[in-house]
């Protein structure tokens, strides 16, 4: 299990903790803004930590994390600031967290940071294990890029539809094909991440960490889709 927890992995966890701490301002930000910007931050951090051993494929994988995180974080931030309909809905559906015990907030914070760390761990292990770039890395990156584009189009189509009728569930574009294409895009993206590191994970510890992150985010996506 030792090779699953090199010292650098704790830097990932600490970074996710620092960035997602924005949730103490508004607790839902632990899983929204804190999520998106944590993934972007972890992508940047891996580029820095392994700057002397990067290859084309590993740079691409890290940059996809950055693109994913900034796109998601930026989209959510814009919605928070500009969408009156969204803010009105959130006031009725989600509590502001002011009465939530501090200990509960801390538990959510730590759990989220751990999840975000394990989500990117397949790429981290590829870098840590010195595996460089191979076919698996490029296939994984391709799947990630497809998921990112798919999710981006879905969010754009939903925003466009909500401007016309804020109260109507979006059923145009990709939403004609699948009920929650934005969530599907998320799942495709993280499947690509797992694929990118599947052939370089060594030992039970690395596999457990990678599967915890993958299963965790897939569970979150299915849970979110069921609530709609």
What are these regions (language model features)?
Residues 31-33, 102-115, 179-186:
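Select subsegments of transmembrane alpha-helices in polytopic membrane proteins
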Residues 78-82, 106, 220, 224:
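A general boundary/transition motif marking the beginning of the first structured unit of a protein
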Residues 16-27, 73-79:
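C-terminal ends of transmembrane helices
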Residues 57-99:
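A basic- and aromatic-enriched beta-loop-alpha substructure that forms the phosphate/nucleotide-
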Residues 88-131, 137-141:
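PAPS-dependent sulfotransferase catalytic domain
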Residues 30-40, 85-107, 168-175:
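Juxtamembrane helix-capping/reentrant segments at transmembrane boundaries
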Residues 3-16, 20, 38-70, 119-157, ...:
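Hydrophobic transmembrane alpha-helices
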């Amino acid at each position: 299990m030792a090779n699953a927890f090199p010292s650098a992995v704790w830097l990932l966890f600490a970074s996710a903790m620092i960035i997602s701490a924005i949730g103490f301002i508004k607790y839902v930000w632990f899983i929204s803004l804190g999520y998106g910007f944590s993934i972007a931050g972890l992508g940047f951090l891996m580029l820095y930590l392994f700057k002397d051993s990067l290859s084309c494929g590993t740079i691409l994988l890290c940059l996809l994390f950055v693109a994913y995180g900034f796109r998601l974080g930026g989209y959510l931030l814009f919605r928070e600031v500009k969408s009156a309909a969204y803010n009105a809905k959130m006031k009725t559906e989600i509590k502001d967290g002011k009465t939530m015990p501090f200990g509960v907030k801390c538990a959510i914070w730590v759990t989220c940071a751990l999840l975000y760390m394990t989500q990117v761990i397949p790429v981290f292990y590829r870098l840590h294990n010195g595996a460089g770039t191979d076919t698996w890395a490029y296939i994984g990156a391709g799947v990630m890029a497809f998921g990112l584009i798919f999710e981006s189009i879905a969010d754009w189509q939903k925003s466009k539809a909500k401007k016309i009728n804020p109260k109507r569930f979006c059923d145009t574009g990709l939403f004609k094909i699948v009920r929650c294409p934005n969530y599907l895009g998320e799942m495709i993206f993280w499947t690509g991440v797992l694929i990118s590191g599947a052939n370089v994970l060594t030992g039970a510890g690395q596999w457990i960490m990678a599967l915890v992150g993958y299963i965790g985010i897939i569970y979150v996506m299915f849970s979110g889709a069921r609530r709609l």
